């Protein structure tokens, strides 16, 4: 709740964590309702309140009913369409202009320039470069753009740091991974963090111009390699919530999946990161974080057999793997990434146990 410093009878309040409806301009034709918080105003010191959330609180003007507030305006940020003002308790009156307010949200900042008008109040998205999004994965395609995987908002195609990025369409909610094929960067996949409503994942063969649905593709990380016959093999690892390091592959563009063999796992293991040698598509790396979370039933502290990083290498395009233990796993969950320094030259992290240089396709 906040007060207008120039008139303490004018108060604004908002909810935090309410799951209710907010309207966009196509509500009457496309049911464009977003679900989030409500905001209210009072002009009599809080004795009476008006719900000024778009789509709420009809007012009587002449012979017709009108909503007090207009539908939310995207303000040129197309990706925010259909998304709500939510997960935020901040509401601020501009001290230089009490007609203007700012509200924080889980996806950025919303503003209004005429909050005290009798009707026609207009809320609009106004992040100005500070969208609050969670990047779960990101790739930079050689000779192309950068592509992100974003929690809640799928992801974006980033072509210019000074321009608003384009969001993937169709949109599928929280995306955990984005990957491209190093032998043909036009081939890409993005996979859902959960089994989302739109699809568990999409693939493209034309650099993102069109996306096609995959089946049962949700998971943690992703990779692609090109087979000898020119077709593509997709990989996905289990999501961290599954507590397994398992890796799966698909030879039919993500419609069916088989389990890769040779990947060690126990209940409690973390999701596995994969990497393809660009000039040797048969060489697939899988960096495994093995963790048996039941160790405490039989010992005072875990040892190497319970918790370790293992680098697994495949020479048959990712069907079967052979693993080499690298170091003790110390529960630094971000240590499983693979950094590529050039052909047969990798760097892998092991938390408090340092970094390791890997050469000779994992032999050294």
Residue ranges and their predicted role:
Residues 1-364:
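Extracellular glycan-interacting surfaces
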